[in-house]
Amino acid sequence: MNRCWALFLSLCCYLRLVSAEGDPIPEELYEMLSDHSIRSFDDLQRLLHGDPGEEDGAELDLNMTRSHSGGELESLARGRRSLGSLTIAEPAMIAECKTRTEVFEISRRLIDRTNANFLVWPPCVEVQRCSGCCNNRNVQCRPTQVQLRPVQVRKIEIVRKKPIFKKATVTLEDHLACKCETVAAARPVTRSPGGSQEQRAKTPQTRVTIRTVRVRRPPKGKHRKFKHTHDKTALKETLGA
């Protein structure tokens, strides 16, 4: 009888595990995350109607059960080591959408696109850019306020093995404010089989008509009797007659 109950319980656990592995993440969860500001794991657990202390309490009860059941100092020491490992690991915090200092490389194309035989100093500077992740996959961290900041750099040219220093101005873009904004999804373009024909019908077509002009030749034999007449005076008299 006990063996049958054990098989039944193991089968139930297996079916539950299989169903849990194949379930996709529901869309309601994405909507729930997008409507709240979640900065830590505790906030996420509160949003999902959970208690932050349940996980730590379960681990503590498990360790205490093992220590009392064994009754040995070694098991108690293992429980203390497991609790110590939990206190060392700090909770993960979300990288919220805000401005951060980033390194921007000043390329030579920003100064002179026609010439590449020079150096730029400094080669890189610091800028403020928006970065971070949002709670929903349909939104992205984007700047809402931008400021243009001109800076002066040195353009170093080598002419006849001598360096020539020139000044150049580069405009940098700093982000002052950020916000998680909705990303417009690209609509799929559906092409019907008759779409190309309709487009051709709507497009005005210019027809070029080429007309061929034929030159009529005089009928043969009309002036055949004057073919061998070389005297112009005799030809005029004959035509005048």
Swiss-Prot record:
InterPro entries per UniProt: Cystine-knot_cytokine, PD_growth_factor_CS, PDGF/VEGF_dom, PDGF_N
Which cellular component appears as one GO term in the record? platelet-derived growth factor complex
Q: Which organism is it from?
A: Homo sapiens
Report which superkingdom the organism of origin falls in. Eukaryota
**Main localization of the protein described in the UniProt heading:** secreted
Q: Which protein are we looking at?
A: Platelet-derived growth factor subunit B
Q: How does it assemble?
A: Antiparallel homodimer; disulfide-linked. Antiparallel heterodimer with PDGFA; disulfide-linked. The PDGFB homodimer interacts with PDGFRA and PDGFRB homodimers, and with heterodimers formed by PDGFRA and PDGFRB. The heterodimer composed of PDGFA and PDGFB interacts with PDGFRB homodimers, and with heterodimers formed by PDGFRA and PDGFRB. Interacts with XLKD1. Interacts with LRP1. Interacts with SORL1 (via the N-terminal ectodomain). Interacts with CD82; this interaction inhibits PDGFB-mediated signaling pathway.
Propeptide ranges are 21-81, 191-241
Q: In which tissues is it expressed?
A: Expressed at high levels in the heart, brain (sustantia nigra), placenta and fetal kidney. Expressed at moderate levels in the brain (hippocampus), skeletal muscle, kidney and lung.
Q: Name one Pfam family in it.
A: PDGF_N
Could you list this entry's UniProt keywords, alphabetically sorted.
Answer: Chromosomal rearrangement, Cleavage on pair of basic residues, Developmental protein, Disease variant, Disulfide bond, Glycoprotein, Growth factor, Mitogen, Pharmaceutical, Proto-oncogene, Secreted, Signal
**Record keywords: Transcription included?**
no
Cleavable signal peptide: 1-20
Q: Give glycosylation sites per the record.
A: 63
Give residue numbers for the site Involved in receptor binding. Answer: 108, 111
For this entry, list what GO says about its biological process.
Answer: angiogenesis; cell chemotaxis; cellular response to growth factor stimulus; cellular response to mycophenolic acid; cellular response to platelet-derived growth factor stimulus; embryonic placenta development; gene expression; heart development
